[in-house]
UniProtKB/Swiss-Prot annotation:
Chain spans, region Disordered: 152-178
Binding site for Zn(2+) 1: 13, 18, 36, 39
Designated name of the protein: Zinc finger AN1 and C2H2 domain-containing stress-associated protein 11
Residues that coordinate or bind Zn(2+) 4: 118, 121, 135, 137
Matching PROSITE patterns: ZF_AN1, ZINC_FINGER_C2H2_1, ZINC_FINGER_C2H2_2
Keywords of the record: Metal-binding, Repeat, Zinc, Zinc-finger
Zinc finger map (C2H2-type): 213-236, 250-273
Amino acid sequence: MGTPEFPDLGKHCSVDVCKQIDFLPFTCDRCLQVFCLDHRSYMKHSCPKGDREDVTVVICPLCAKGVRLNPNEDPNITWEKHVNTDCDPSNYEKATKKKKCPVPRCKEYLTFSNTIKCRDCNVDHCLKHRFGPDHTCPGPRKLPFMGFLSSSTTRKEAKTTRPNKAHPSTSSSSSSSRWSNLLSSAEAGISRLGNDISQKLQFSSSKDNGIVEVCPQCGAKFSSVTSLVEHVEKTHERNKKQNHGNVTVDVCPRCSRGFRDPVDLVNHIERDHRGTSKA
């Protein structure tokens, strides 16, 4: 087995009938024996441990659910557990019944690829009946309050039409009352408009003849803008000047010049007196 250069190269297949030497053998992960390419599967070499991790699922005829059989357990016991605990016969119709197109005489089953929902009626249809005229679309759904409004309007119309047939005088009285209401509302609007116009005219006349200008500082009233300006210059400007009299002033020791800002005084001494501050 192998060659003089590689004595361990290749192994014989474990199947008694085969015993073929394979230079790339396969080792079974269950029985840990060596096999050739033709006998590498569990069924080909009849592996005694091949069903340990085997997954076998049986479809229940009552609920159409998958039942997984345990290799280390009797299938009858597994089936009894499913029937007693997890089996639901009502699920059979949901799982087996396929959805069809709602159009009469259409036998097309609706799947993921051939289903289109109508934007107006929100119902699923097949590709053949996807347009509204093909499936007699009733149109978009009406809102409930729209129906309430339409019913209320029909009731009002019925109430108004019934007395018209029985008593024509009542219809004339109702129309006259409506006209009177319209006239009264129009008169009220006109009176309000007249009051607003009169108020504006009074305000403009008071501007021309009365006291309209008010001082923002003391609240004094004046008949013209010029008098208001004179008042501000005489009274309030003087008060500002008097208040500014309390500001500290720094005096130059050489020329007795006053400065409000000490920085300006230092710059003046360095510029005019060449940096000397001798008295």
